[in-house]
C-alpha cells in the first residue's frame, strides 16, 4: 500500500509533511534514479502553478534531481497538460508538476508524467516510495563530476500556445465570439487568453492576476457563478472557467447557466459519432457521471464505459480499450487524439469548434443531454473507515435505495485527494434525493463524527 502517493500524486499542506522541502528533495532523488536509464544525459522537466510554495518545492526537487546526475528543465508556471506536452515533445525522461490543482493555495502537490506524457503507474510510485523510506537512495549518489545541471526553458508557454492552436480546425476561427475566460489566477493565466485571442475571439479575462495566494480563491471552475455574472453583464456568448492547473474546464452558456463536464462530454462525443471519429463508438466516464449521459449516448448510437473516479483511471481504461475520448463530470476531459491527459483549454477549443462549425449557441448544443437531478453532500471525516460496517449507516443507505425503486442510485465514496466522504444521489425528484442525501450525511456525522457540507 502506498504511503505518499494518492490518486493524483503526493498532496498536502505546503511546508507540512509530506509537502516539505526535505521530502520534495527525496522525491526528486528517487525519481531521478528511476528515470536514469543508460549512459546518455538524462533530463526531467519541472513545471508548476502559481502557488507561493511552488518556489520552495521547485528548488528542492531541482536539487534532488541534479544530485542524482540528471539535468532539470525548468518551464515555470504552465498548465499541467502543457508540462505533459513539453515532456513528450522535448523527449525528456519525465515531467514533474508542482500543483494541487483546484485546492486552495495552502495546499500543494507533486505528480509525475512519463516520457510519453502519461501519468505514472502505481508500480513506479511504489518503487519511488521504497527508495525513499528504505534510505537506499542515500547510497546511490553519483560523484561530484556527474551531478546534473538546471536549465530554464523561456519559451515553454509560447510552445504550448502553438500546440493548442494546432488542435483547432484550420478552416475555422473564433471571430464573432465574445468569451468570458476565468483562469483561476492559476497556471493558464497567460496561455489561455493568448490562445483564444490569437484565434480571433474577443476575450474578457478574469482570474489573470496571480499573487501566490489567490489561486482558486472565489474564481475558476469551482466558482462558476463569477463567470456567469460576467457573461450576463457583458452580453458574452459563453464563459469558460479553468482550475488552478488548467486540467479541467467548466462552461456557462449565454444565459449564465452552468454546463458541466457530463454535458460537454455528451456534446463532443455525439459530434464525434456523427463524424465517425469516436473510436468504437465509446465514451469513457466515471461512476460520478450522471445517468443522463448514458441515455444521451445510447440515443446517439454510442455507449459509455464507466471507471473509478480519477482522470488517471479514465486514461487507463482508454488505453486498455483503444478509446479516444473520456472525462469526468468535474470537467477533466481527455482527447487522446491530441494530448495524453486532461486539458481545459484544449477541451474548450473542441467545444468552440463545434459551435462555429454548426453556428449554434452553447445552450442549443447542451440540449443533447437531459441530466437526472443529482445531489452531492460531502462529510469531512478525520479518518477513512468502512461505513457499511456501521449497522445504522448501512440500514439508512439500504432504505434510501429501496425508496429510489431502481429509478436512481446512491453512490458513496471517499475522495482521493481530500479527507471527505462524498454522498451522491440521483433520482427523478430533486427534493426527495436532497432530503435523503442529508439523512445519510446526518447518520454518518452521528456515528463517525465529522462535518457535512453541500
Curated annotation (Swiss-Prot):
GO terms for biological process: carbohydrate metabolic process; peptidoglycan biosynthetic process; UDP-N-acetylglucosamine biosynthetic process. This is Phosphoglucosamine mutase. Binds 1 Mg(2+) ion per subunit. It comes from the Bacteria. Belongs to the phosphohexose mutase family. Mg(2+) binds at residues 101, 243, 245, 247. The active site is at residue 101. One of its GO terms (cellular component) is cytosol. Catalyzes the conversion of glucosamine-6-phosphate to glucosamine-1-phosphate. The keyword Metal-binding applies. Activated by phosphorylation. Keywords: Isomerase, Magnesium, Metal-binding, Phosphoprotein. Its EC number is 5.4.2.10. The modification Phosphoserine is found at residue 101. HAMAP family: GlmM_B. Coiled coil: none annotated. One of its GO terms (molecular function) is phosphoglucosamine mutase activity.
Amino acid at each position: 500500500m502506498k504511503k505518499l502517493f494518492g490518486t493524483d500524486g503526493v498532496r498536502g499542506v505546503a511546508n507540512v509533511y509530506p509537502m516539505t522541502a526535505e521530502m520534495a528533495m527525496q522525491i526528486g532523488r528517487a525519481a531521478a534514479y528511476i528515470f536514469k536509464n543508460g549512459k546518455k544525459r538524462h533530463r526531467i522537466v519541472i513545471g508548476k502553478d502559481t502557488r507561493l510554495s511552488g518556489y520552495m518545492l521547485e528548488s528542492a526537487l531541482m536539487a534532488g534531481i541534479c544530485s542524482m546526475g540528471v539535468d532539470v528543465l525548468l518551464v515555470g508556471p504552465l498548465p499541467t497538460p502543457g508540462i505533459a506536452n513539453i515532456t513528450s515533445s522535448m523527449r525528456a525522461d519525465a515531467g514533474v508538476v508542482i500543483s494541487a490543482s483546484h485546492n486552495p493555495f495552502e495546499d500543494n502537490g507533486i505528480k509525475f508524467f512519463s516520457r510519453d506524457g502519461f501519468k505514472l503507474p502505481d508500480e513506479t510510485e511504489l518503487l519511488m516510495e521504497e527508495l525513499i523510506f528504505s534510505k537506499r537512495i542515500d547510497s546511490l549518489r553519483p560523484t561530484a563530476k556527474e551531478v546534473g545541471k538546471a536549465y530554464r526553458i523561456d519559451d515553454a508557454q509560447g510552445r504550448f500556445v502553438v500546440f493548442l492552436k494546432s488542435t483547432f480546425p484550420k478552416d475555422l476561427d473564433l471571430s464573432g465570439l465574445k468569451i468570458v475566460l476565468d483562469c483561476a489566477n492559476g497556471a493558464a493565466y497567460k496561455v489561455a487568453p493568448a490562445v483564444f485571442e490569437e484565434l480571433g475571439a474577443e476575450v474578457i479575462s478574469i482570474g489573470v492576476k496571480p499573487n501566490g495566494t489567490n489561486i482558486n480563491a472565489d474564481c475558476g471552475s469551482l466558482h462558476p457563478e463569477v463567470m456567469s455574472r460576467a457573461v450576463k453583464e457583458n452580453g458574452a456568448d459563453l464563459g469558460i472557467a479553468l482550475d488552478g492547473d488548467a486540467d479541467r474546464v467548466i462552461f456557462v452558456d449565454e444565459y449564465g447557466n452552468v454546463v458541466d463536464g457530463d454535458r460537454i462530454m455528451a456534446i463532443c462525443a455525439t459530434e464525434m459519432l456523427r463524424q465517425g471519429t469516436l473510436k468504437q463508438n465509446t465514451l469513457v466516464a466515471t461512476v460520478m457521471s450522471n445517468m443522463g449521459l448514458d441515455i444521451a449516448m445510447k440515443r446517439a448510437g454510442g455507449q459509455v464505459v464507466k471507471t473509478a473516479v480519477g482522470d488517471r483511471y479514465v486514461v487507463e481504461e482508454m488505453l486498455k480499450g483503444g478509446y479516444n475520448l473520456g472525462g469526468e463530470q468535474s470537467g477533466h476531459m481527455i482527447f487522446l487524439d491530441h494530448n495524453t491527459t486532461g486539458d481545459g483549454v484544449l477541451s474548450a477549443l473542441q467545444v468552440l469548434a463545434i459551435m462555429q462549425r454548426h453556428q449554434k449557441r452553447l445552450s442549443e448544443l447542451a440540449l443533447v443531454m437531459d441530466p437526472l437531478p443529482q445531489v452531492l453532500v460531502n462529510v469531512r471525516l478525520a479518518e477513512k473507515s468502512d461505513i457499511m460496517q456501521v449497522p445504522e449507516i448501512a440500514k439508512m443507505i439500504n432504505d434510501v435505495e429501496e425508496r429510489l425503486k431502481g429509478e436512481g442510485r446512491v453512490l458513496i465514496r471517499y475522495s482521493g485527494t481530500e479527507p471527505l466522504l462524498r454522498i451522491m444521489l440521483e433520482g427523478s425528484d430533486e427534493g426527495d434525493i436532497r432530503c435523503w442525501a442529508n439523512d445519510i450525511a446526518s447518520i454518518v456525522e452521528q456515528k463517525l463524527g465529522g462535518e457535512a457540507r453541500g
